[in-house]
A protein has these predicted regions:
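Short glycine/proline- and aromatic-enriched beta-strand/turn motifs that initiate or cap beta-hairpins
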Residues: 12-65, 229
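Short, well-ordered amphipathic alpha-helices
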Residues: 13-16, 122-127, 178-179
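Flexible, solvent-exposed loop segments that connect beta-strands
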Residues: 45-60, 93-116, 149-167, 203-215
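Gram-negative (and chloroplast) outer-membrane scaffold detector with strong preference
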Residues: 25-29, 37, 41-43, 72-152, ...
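Residues that define the transmembrane beta-barrel architecture of outer-membrane proteins
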Residues: 27-31, 63-67, 115-121, 135, ...
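Predominantly the C-terminal beta-signal and adjacent terminal strand-loop region
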Residues: 169-230
Length: 230
C-alpha cells in the first residue's frame, strides 16, 4: 500500500508543473498546527496466576477513536533534516472487556473504560526526500512525554460503586512513522501516519478484581494527522 501511495503522489507531482513556495526551504524556522485522529489501546501482560483467579476466562482490548490537537515548531538542522517540537493535547479512550464464568456456568462480560486527556510534549526528527516539484516524502522518529490531566489515580476504590482501572498520570513513548509533504500555493500540507509505543507500565496495582489479573499495561496508539505549515 505504501508503494501505491508513493506512485500516486509522484504522478500528482508530475502533473503539477508550477513550483509553489519556492523559497520555503531557504528558511530555517517553520511554524504550524496539526489536526489528528488517533486509535489508542494498551499492550497488556496477564498476571502469572491469571487462569486461577476470580473465575476470569478472558481479557480483551477494544481500541477506541480519539483526536489530537498540536502546535508545530520546526528547525532545519541541515537540508532535508529537521527537528520538530509539537506540544498539544491528545484525547484517548480505551475499553477493556473482562469475561467471567459465573456459578451457573454462564459467561458474563464486564467492560471498563479508561479515558485520558494527555498534555503531550513530543520532539521528533524528520528526514525528508528532495522535492519533486510540489511533493516530498519523509520518515520520522522521536520521543514524547505525556501528562494525563484526567487521571483518576487518586480515586478511593472503597468508596466507589463501580471499581475502575487506575493508571499513572505520566507516560513516555517512542514515536515512529512517515508521511507526505504537499507544497500548495500559500502553505505546506502534510499527511502523516505514526505509531506511538509507550515504555512504562501504567497500571496501578490496587488489588481489585480487575487489576490483580493484569501485570502490565503499556500505551499504544496509531495516529493519522494533517499538518498545516507556513
Amino acid at each position: 500500500m505504501f508503494f501505491m501511495l508513493m506512485f500516486s503522489m509522484d504522478a500528482y507531482a508530475q502533473r503539477n508543473t508550477a513550483t509553489n513556495l519556492s523559497g520555503f526551504d531557504r528558511r530555517n524556522y517553520h511554524f504550524g498546527f496539526i489536526l489528528g485522529y488517533n486509535s489508542s489501546n494498551f499492550s497488556m501482560q496477564r498476571a502469572p496466576d491469571f487462569d486461577f483467579t476470580d473465575s476470569l476466562l478472558a481479557i480483551t482490548m477494544r481500541p477506541q477513536p480519539g483526536f489530537n490537537l498540536n502546535l508545530l515548531a520546526s528547525y532545519d538542522l541541515m537540508p532535508n533534516f529537521h527537528i520538530r517540537f509539537l506540544p498539544g493535547l491528545s484525547f484517548q479512550d480505551r475499553i477493556m472487556d473482562f469475561t467471567f464464568l459465573e456459578s451457573d456456568l454462564d459467561r458474563k462480560t464486564e467492560s471498563r473504560r479508561i479515558e485520558s486527556v494527555y498534555l503531550d510534549f513530543p520532539i521528533n526528527f524528520k528526514l525528508r526526500t528532495n522535492r519533486s516539484r510540489n511533493f516530498a516524502a519523509y520518515m520520522l522518529a522521536g520521543g514524547k512525554y505525556s501528562l494525563d490531566m484526567q487521571s483518576q489515580k487518586d480515586v478511593n476504590q472503597d468508596l466507589s460503586a463501580n471499581q475502575i482501572i487506575k493508571i499513572i498520570d505520566h507516560d513516555y513513548s517512542v514515536d515512529i512513522g512517515g508521511g507526505f509533504d504537499f507544497f500548495l500555493e500559500y502553505f505546506k500540507l502534510s499527511l502523516e501516519f505514526k505509531s506511538s509505543l509507550g515504555i512504562p507500565n501504567l497500571l496501578i496495582q490496587d488489588d481489585t478484581i480487575y487489576s490483580r489479573n493484569v501485570s502490565s499495561l503499556k500505551s499504544r496508539a496509531f495516529i493519522f494527522s494533517i499538518t498545516f505549515e507556513g
